[in-house]
C-alpha cells in the first residue's frame, strides 16, 4: 500500500524544482521573460520571436474557453445522467423490477459485502481525519503499547488493523494470486487464437470445393444429382420475425423436388399459430414444398421440437438437414455454398456458416455484442475449424449430415444447449466439422438488456450442465488423448468455467476487497494494462468498433456477474439452469428486405397465384389473411427493469472507489469509479433499448 499523501501532493507529484516567474511589461515592445528555476540554464536557447502581452492574453482566453466548454459538457452529461436515473427510480410498475427467484444467494452475498464495506469505510474516514494513517511504510507503524492508544475508538481501529494484517490479508493474497494465474492463462489462450487467425489470413486457408459439384441437366429445374435437403425453421411465439425467415428460406436456390421446408411451430399463442399457418399456405400456393408442424405436447424446448420433426417417416429420404432459427435470413445461394462440401468427404458431419447482424448499430448494447460475436466467429470458430475440425455448433445457420445426427444419438433434451450437446457427441464419434467464414447469414442480436441477459444466462449455464453429463463419455471415448484434453481443459474448463469465474472474482470481489485490505494490493498491470490489451485483441475482427474499447471493457466486467451466476447454476444444478426463455426479437430487416416490402404484389400476380385454387381453399386463405392483419395490430407492452445485483455491485464499487481516494491510488480509483458507474447504468437498465 502506498503511503498516504495529501491531496495537493497527489495531484502534483511531479512538480519541477523552482518556482516559475512571469514578468509582464506594459510596453508592448518588450518581450515576456520566464524564469523557471536552476534547470533553465541547461535548456537550448529558442531563437524565435517572443510573444507579447496581447498574444499571451489571447492564448489564456482560448484555453479558458476550452476549459469552460469541457466543464459545460461534463455538467450536461452528468445532469442528463441524473435525470435518467431519477426517471427510472420513479418507475413504479410491478413488472419494473427483476425477479431474483432461486438466484437470490448471490444478491444476498453482495448485500452483506456492501454492508461490511460501508462500516469499514466509516472507520477509515474517521481515522483519516484524526490522522491515523497506518499503511505499509517504514516510517509508519501500528501502535502496540497501551501508551500509544488514545481512546476506545482508537483501540478498536488498531485491533481491526491487526486482524486485517494477520488473518484477512493472507487468504485474499492467495485468492488474488490464483485468479491472476487464471487470468494470464486465459490471456495466453486468447493470444494464441489470434495468432492462429493471423496465420489463416496470411496463408489464405479456407475450405474449398469443385466449382460445379452438382450438374443440372433438366431444363425444368429438377436435378437428380442434387442431394435431398431438409430445411427446418424451429420457432416459438416469434411474432416479429417469422415472416422474414420463412420468406428467405422459401427463396433458397435448390431444385424444388430436392428440398422440403419444415416450419416447426411451438407457439402456445393461437393467434401467432394462425399467422404462421397463413404464411406457410401462401408459399405453398407458390409451389414451394413446405409444411407446417405444431406439437400438441411441447416438451424439451427446441431440442424436443427438432427431435419430433426428425421422427417423421419422410425424413428417411433426405441426406442433409439445414437449420435456421426464426430470425435468420439466409441468402438464396446458401445451400449451394455449404452442401457441396459434403461431397467426396464422408467424414464431414457439419458445415457451419457465420452470423451477421442487421441491427448491430441500433444502440450501444448491440454494438458491444457485435464485438464479442465477431471475435467468436472470426477467431474462435475459424481457428478451431481449421486446426481441430471441431467447434461448438451455433444452433442455427448450419447444415448437418443426417447420418451424423443419428449415429451421435440425435437431439437430446437433457440440457438447454442442445447445439453444443450434439456437437460434442458427434466429435466423440469421429465426425469432422467445417466452418465457412465467407458464408454469412443475416440475423438479429438482442436490443434490450433484459433479453441479452437471459440469453447469456442460458449460454453459460448450459455448458456446465453438459460438462457434468458428458465428462464420463469424453474420458471413455476412443478419440485421441489430445482431443480429450482439448475438450476438457480448453473447450469446457478454460473457456466456459474459468473465464466467468476469474473475471467476476478478480474485478468485482478481490479488487474492492484490496481497497479495504491494502496489504493485498492488486498490481496496476492486472487492472489496466493487460485488460486493455486483451480488449484490443477482441476488437481486431471489428475495427470500426475501436472507439468503444473502454465501454466494451467496462461492460464485459459488468456482464461477468450474470455469467458467473449462470456458471454456478449450471455446475450445481440450480433451478435457473433449466429455464429456457426465447430471446426477444425486434424484427429488423435489411435494406434489401425493406425495398422488397415496398414493392407490393399487383392484382395480376395475385390472380396468377390463386389460379387453380378451389373456392374453399380461397376462402380459408382469405380468412387467414384477415386474422393475420388483425393480430399484427395488437400492441405489445414492454418495460425496462431494475436489476438488484448490478445495483448492489455498483454501490460496492463506488464505496471502494471512495476508500481508494483516501489512499491516493489514482489508477485504482478511476477504474473503480468508472466500473461502478457502469454497473449503475446497467442496473437501472439505461443501456440498450429504452421502452416506455
UniProtKB/Swiss-Prot annotation:
InterPro entries: Glyco_trans_2-like, Nucleotide-diphossugar_trans. It holds the Pfam family Glyco_trans_2_3. It is found in: Golgi apparatus membrane. Its EC number is 2.4.1.-. It is an enzyme of class 2 (transferase). The modification Phosphoserine is found at residue 614. The active site is at residues 266, 419. Probable beta-1,4-glucan synthase rather involved in the synthesis of the xyloglucan backbone than cellulose. Seems to work simultaneously with xyloglucan 6-xylosyltransferase. Xyloglucan is a noncellulosic polysaccharides of plant cell wall and consists of a glucan backbone substituted by xylose, galactose and fucose. This is Probable xyloglucan glycosyltransferase 5. The lineage of its organism: Eukaryota, Viridiplantae, Streptophyta, Embryophyta, Tracheophyta.
